[in-house]
Design a protein with these regions (language model features):
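Residue-level signal for functionally critical sites in structured catalytic/ligand-binding pockets
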Residues: 8-10, 17-18, 109-120
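Hydrophobic transmembrane alpha-helix bundles
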Residues: 38-39, 45-46, 62-66, 111-125, ...
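Hydrophobic alpha-helical core bundles mediating ligand binding, dimerization, or RNAP-core interactions
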Residues: 54-55, 94-101, 114, 118-125
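Generic detector of well-ordered alpha-helical segments enriched in charged/polar residues
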Residues: 60-67, 94-98, 132-136, 144
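A structural motif
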Residues: 85-96
Length: 145
């Protein structure tokens, strides 16, 4: 397993699933858990169909859609490197966006569809008070304390 040096990832556990952190810690998830994580803190195995990789550029496009006062909420504090949201229903578009995120040669329409689907997945975490600080830490790692 290789550590991911990059931006962030969204993982979806259809069944029980284990993620390995860079520090060797194991995190266990149940079926229906949607995870947003700092990709540099996760070791990803070859089973990447459960992951959507989100680039810094895509995250930067997501931020302007948020209210300015939301961005000022404790952006400097230390936060967990991952967040979990339990979904009560299956996420039918997850496999499509996972496939699109692995493809490097997307047509323009596919790129726009991928971005829109990633924004929809990111919006699931908006009610979590730790989401925006984690998002800002991913974008500006020098702010970590």
């Amino acid at each position: 397993m290789q550590p991911l040096h990059g931006n962030c990832l969204i993982a979806y556990a259809r069944h029980k699933y284990i993620l390995t952190m860079v520090n060797g810690e194991y995190r266990y998830f149940n079926g229906g858990d949607l995870v947003f994580a700092d990709a540099s803190q996760i070791r990803v195995d070859k089973c990447v169909e459960n992951f959507v990789f989100v680039s810094r550029d895509t995250l930067s496009l997501f931020l302007p859609m948020l209210k300015e006062e939301a961005l000022n909420l404790h952006a400097h504090k230390k936060v967990s490197s991952l967040l979990v949201h339990h979904c009560t229903r299956d996420i039918p578009v997850f496999q499509e966006v996972a496939q699109l995120s692995q493809n490097k040669n997307l047509r323009y329409a596919e790129m726009l569809r991928k971005r829109a689907l990633i924004f929809a997945l990111l919006s699931v975490f908006l009610e979590d008070t730790q989401f925006i600080p984690l998002l800002l830490n991913v974008l500006q790692p020098n702010m970590r304390t």
